[in-house]
Curated annotation (Swiss-Prot):
Cofactor(s) required for function per UniProt: heme
Annotated pathway: Mycotoxin biosynthesis
Residues given in the record as heme binding sites: 237
Similarity remark: Belongs to the cytochrome P450 family.
UniProt-listed Enzyme Commission number(s): 1.-.-.-
UniProt record, GO biological process: secondary metabolic process
Single GO MF annotation: oxidoreductase activity, acting on paired donors, with incorporation or reduction of molecular oxygen
Protein name: Cytochrome P450 monooxygenase aclO
Domain of life: Eukaryota
Function, in words: Cytochrome P450 monooxygenase; part of the gene cluster that mediates the biosynthesis of aspirochlorine (or antibiotic A30641), an unusual halogenated spiro compound with distinctive antifungal properties due to selective inhibition of protein biosynthesis, and which is also active against bacteria, viruses, and murine tumor cells. The non-ribosomal peptide synthetase (NRPS) aclP is responsible the formation of the diketopiperazine (DKP) core from the condensation of 2 phenylalanine residues.
Key words of the record: Heme, Iron, Metal-binding, Monooxygenase, Oxidoreductase
Database matches in InterPro entries: Cyt_P450, Cyt_P450_CS, Cyt_P450_E_grp-IV, Cyt_P450_sf
The UniProt record lists the keyword Metal-binding: yes
Length: 306
């Protein structure tokens, strides 16, 4: 999945041949892994020690080395773009050149944007209780429902609200003192807002949109006081629509080629299929790495699971 994300983003952000260069692909993957590893280690470190610890982490040195090599690979492409000017590809690099002439030759900026674009998502396809209708997959209708259900059951735990002053919440009356922090993802566990909030339901928001007045609410990239995965207000993620479309396109590509199931479904077909619990590590929520997801090509279903 991570490689698929890297290939997809690279194609959007910079055209071939660099986007299909194996060394470039490996660099984007390694840089993403190093970044996540550093973030995980730093999240468990006292804030006062983080500036010192960061310099001694081996992954920090790896990131510096990876960034330097990425600059070297990107330089010929950027120089060719600046000289060419005509018949150039329509990608992120060209967009920066066209819209930010003062930074068009900033190799560090271009490299950072390319490397920091890589991101990944989910293994919840295997738990869908009924198959996704192919025509609706093309329309991305059921795809949106799946992703909305995933976003609710796996909220962004690194997003916190800190009170800068004492706040009194009237109903129920509760005083929130200055300096307190609240995990915004906890709103998705509130049973006064959601039915069976801790269970995964890929069609939860489809049902909610059937209620009059909710027809346009609860979209995957929506932001509101009850939908905080992408942030809220001026702090909402500006790239959420691009990211959501990217995820949808990748899953459509996977569903059109493969089918998925958990390994325990194969051994016990009569058992009720349950989604394996997540692994929570600090601010990170991850699929259980010990869970085996079986994949079979739809092109030849007789070959068995791979």
């Amino acid at each position: 999945m991570v490689k698929l994300v890297s290939l997809h983003i690279s194609r959007s952000f910079i055209q071939s041949p660099l986007s299909r260069n194996q060394e470039w692909i490996d660099l984007t993957l390694d840089y993403a892994i190093s970044t996540v590893t550093v973030a995980g280690k730093m999240s468990n470190t006292h804030w006062a020690l983080r500036p010192f610890k960061g310099h001694f982490l081996p992954e920090t040195a790896d990131m510096s080395r990876q960034f330097t090599r990425a600059r070297e690979l990107l330089r010929p492409t950027l120089e060719a773009r600046l000289q060419q000017r005509d018949k150039v590809p329509n990608d992120l690099m060209q967009w920066i050149i066209n819209n930010y002439p003062d930074q068009e030759d900033d190799l560090t900026l271009h490299t950072r944007l390319q490397l920091e674009a890589v991101q990944a998502a989910t293994y919840n396809l295997a738990i869908m209780q009924r198959p996704l209708d192919s025509s609706r997959v093309v329309e991305l209708a059921e795809m949106r429902q799946l992703l909305e259900g995933v976003a609710k059951i796996e909220p962004d735990r690194d997003c916190e609200r800190e009170s800068l002053c004492t706040v009194t919440i009237p109903t129920p009356r509760w005083k929130h003192s200055a300096g307190w922090c609240l995990r915004l993802g906890t709103i998705y566990d509130d049973d006064s807002l959601w039915t069976d909030p801790t269970s995964f339901d890929g069609y939860r928001f489809e049902k909610l949109r059937t209620i009059k007045g909710n027809e346009l609410k609860f979209q995957y990239a929506s932001t509101s006081t009850s939908e905080l995965n992408w942030g809220y207000g001026t702090h909402a993620c500006p790239g959420r629509h691009y990211a959501s479309n990217q995820i949808k396109l990748m899953i459509v590509s996977l569903l059109s080629r493969y089918e998925f199931q958990f390994d325990h479904e194969q051994t016990d077909k009569k058992a009720i299929v349950e989604r394996p619990p997540n692994v929570v590590d600090g601010v990170r929520i991850m699929p259980n790495p010990q869970t085996l997801v079986m994949v079979r090509s739809l092109g030849n279903v007789n070959e068995g699971c791979e």
